[in-house]
């Protein structure tokens, strides 16, 4: 869409942060209003992350107004909230391309702009990176400032606290801004806190505090009295004791939608030494009532009509794999009170809403704490329960040592329901589920299953749930199932594949939900088609049978080729000295960028046409 200067006259003056800083302060509330309306107009036309950005408009304007970005370095955690940042940093006219193939990246991305200091997508990384950047800036000696913005969800992760503990030890000059949208501030309390924050962040107070420490350092009773007086004043309205104990100078909470008040507080804090912590209160979805009322639904949106206040409903077609999992979870829990389900802050995405309502005492959302989720599951298993960890492929990476050390070595029966496996689409490199088969396959005695449809997915979940000799995993993709009939649940024989079609010369060994595309190729080439089902243990007998009865083999998977299921097939053949040629089809050796699942599969040759072309070229 073209930018309408008449509709956004103040925003039209800002093509860069340098131009932003030329605006008089009095015009900034109007700029915030236009920026919020432009964000609504843009995202409703193109889709994207929405409610978080609406909540950070004033903060974004204030930070770029006070700090000399990009010389001063601004780091956004996760990046869902960074759309206003992109708009103000030279990407205003391209914001309608965000999350689209070839368009703006969905998160801050170093290769896209000098303003994007840290490429992000996963949570809770900002403070750790910020400390490193602040230490480097100190050694550089050019008075470059460092600011990290982290949300109330992301700050619950252990990594954030590890970083803050380190910052309190080495005391770099940096600012951490906590964007807290979990609660609202009443007018009176908010006004009092805003006034106190400006007082406590001011130079006079800071000078008195530091000077007093020096003057009375040799007089313990007076020093202790001053310390207690300060704590008493701050403790009346400031919930910052934890951050103070970690070594930060805590200021807040303040109204995150008062842009002029934020500017005053940020200017006061800009030149303070040591680690600083500013706690701001915002409302997710601010300025668009439907998003304010339901920020979870409006977190990420398809194209929609803003005047209606409603998102388009799904067509009521096939259920998603997440829903298949959620339905199976409820069905199984109703029969077995030992079932416990765990998610690291992905209740909606993992299809667990109904389960959480029906079985609240057996549902555990551990927040953004993947490591804890896995070891918590280990403890439940030790206690005689049957834990299921529902987690996205890309987030399970964050708990790899816990899978190894706390679950697998102890042979604990923990079932991993791995959602968003393979290509996920618009969220790009940081969210593709490209590596789970590779990083799980090397774990001794791990059972790994890859369903080809929703019925097989249910059977595999059932099989894994009843497997008691160690951990198991079922990986399934983002998106809808294929529409097969659901049959009664029964355990599958571990490590056994099935032949779906008999052909000649060529055998296609398929792992997972690319099966419909592989079936088209098998039909076209008159190839044998095998549903391998298990990545570990592999059906070695079936692989050797296919090698003996065919001239060539092709493996198909939506995982990195390196270390994936196809690599396992190669290992079996080499171990048995079988000289049959094998073509491995899967994800190539680079991070897969954004685009729809269909676009990326076509580009990577993972649709039927692409697979057939690869096979013909290889056989030629």
Curated annotation (Swiss-Prot):
Catalytic activity: D-glyceraldehyde 3-phosphate + pyruvate + H(+) = 1-deoxy-D-xylulose 5-phosphate + CO2
The protein's required cofactors: Mg(2+); thiamine diphosphate
Residues the entry annotates as binding thiamine diphosphate: 80, 121-123, 153-154, 181, 288, 370
Binding-site positions, Mg(2+): 152, 181
Keywords recorded for this protein, A-Z: Isoprene biosynthesis, Magnesium, Metal-binding, Thiamine biosynthesis, Thiamine pyrophosphate, Transferase
Pfam family name, one: Transketolase_C
Gene Ontology terms, MF aspect: 1-deoxy-D-xylulose-5-phosphate synthase activity; magnesium ion binding; thiamine pyrophosphate binding
The species this protein was found in: Escherichia coli O1:K1 / APEC
Enzyme class: transferase
Name listed for the protein in its UniProt record: 1-deoxy-D-xylulose-5-phosphate synthase
GO cellular component, one term: cytosol
